[in-house]
Amino acid sequence: MRTPSFPQAAAELILAGPVGPLEVVVDPPKADVTPQPVVAIVCHPLSTEGGTLHNKVVTMAATALRELGLTTVRFNFRSVGGSAGTFDHGTGEQDDLKAVAAWVRAELPQHRLWLVGFSFGAFVSLKAAADLQPEALVSIAPPAGRWDFSGIVPPANWLVIQGEQDEIVDPQAVYDWLEDIQAPHTLVRM
């Protein structure tokens, strides 16, 4: 499979992933803002519970980042939409994220990388952050208590966003986990 060039306009692409094609959507910054040399890869929630790159929180996060002048890349983890493979409980999904990040860095070496994840996507991006070394990490409703968060070393520039009335991710479990790991972070409670 030929590796596509990074598009200048909004585009849907297929990348070669670790176990086959990965479905990717690239969106440039909003037209009325100054573009920043940053690409934010936004990761979706649990695929076995319907998570896709089209998830409402994922698309809203990408839109907010584009309004700040960032280019966004959303993709489907293995087994979702046009992405090949089978669900791998976060391990293979980290490989998918690393493949997308490698493509971004090869195509736009002058750009900085941010990782953004919602729920399961927050778990995957947190686990991959040590290897990918993003400039910033944004974790929206990280599912503490639902997945093994041991060994996670977030970057210094880490934003955690947690809804106080979240019905899926227990807010107190997130707050307790943040206190236990004692990693520098900014917490936004909504």
Where would I find each of the regions flagged by the language model?
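Alpha/beta-hydrolase active-site loop
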Residues: V57, F87-L108
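Gly/Ala-rich beta-loop-alpha elbow adjacent to hydrolase catalytic centers
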Residues: V116-S125
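Catalytic histidine neighborhood in serine/cysteine hydrolases
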Residues: D180-M190
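N-terminal cap/lid segment of alpha/beta-hydrolase-fold proteins
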Residues: M1-P35
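Active-site nucleophile loop of the alpha/beta-hydrolase fold
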Residues: P45-L46, V138-D148, G163-Q165
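Short beta-strand/loop motif that positions the catalytic acidic residue
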Residues: P154-Q162, D166, V174
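Short, surface-exposed "cap/lid" segments of acyl-processing enzymes
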Residues: K30-N76
